[in-house]
């Protein structure tokens, strides 16, 4: 039985580009050939998969939110996408990381804005536990924030 295995691949930029284009096309074809972008939310995208999709040029869009924020706090379109980030805060919202150094030290991500719930139905105690006196909704999730405004959930 003979097996032909690759022993050496000369990785010239032209070859690398063509291989990536071929892989990207195969992925897009698997989605019917008409996919514009892959939208991810509800749970983090596996880091290895995210890096792979990014490396072959598959357009990825990431969003982060909660039921209480109906539904988004952050969102990034593929043209402003940064690997590992769930994007900057969406319009009509404010968000920040409660940390002495939000860029380097994770802290709780809090948000306020038009789409934050008014409170839990008939449960003031639960509402007070998550929305402070300044109207910030406490997500309970840890994050960092880059100078660009992109958030990174930890």
Predicted regions: what they are:
Residues 36-37, 60, 79-82, 102, ...:
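Short, flexible coil/turn micro-motifs enriched in small/turn-prone residues
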Residues 40, 59, 70, 81, ...:
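Residue-level signal for pocket-adjacent positions within structured domains
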Residues 89, 96, 103-154:
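Conserved ATP-binding/catalytic segment of the ANL
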